[in-house]
Amino acid sequence: MSVGHSVTSDHQLARLLQIGIVLEEVVEARAHHHYQSLAEEDRDLDDEIESLLEHAAEESAEHRNALEELIAGLEADSVPFEEIETLVEAQYGQTKPEDFDGILYDQLCNEETAYKFYDDLIKAIEDSDVEFSVDRATLLSVLRDLRAAERDGVERVTTIMEERA
């Protein structure tokens, strides 16, 4: 399921928010994978990358909590996790961490993917005239905050990459 032109029901919104949760889990898992792949001496030498990866993991956990709170307020049945995971893998999981030339490129891809997802979801909600069982203003505010955090992540990774070029 991709973010369409508009969101037409609580069920569809819940499903899209669940996709966001899985995306955040992917970002966290990939950040953890990269951190674990750093040699011990690299962990000590590159505090900036270590900090970036730690921040990405912490931010993803916070984002998942915010999305879970929104889902809890919806009048919709939960979609099985396995189904959502399959949808995310098909739509957003085309690459693996080792497909990138380094940690920073992969992290940039993760941040950009999450930003694009939230941006598309916000537009789809704004294009919808459906009344959801959660407050629309609150919903959009939370999603805009998540999008802004992802934009900041893109900028942070880009700055680090430019400084190292």
Cite the ranges covered by each PLM segment.
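Non-heme di-metal
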Residues: S2-A165
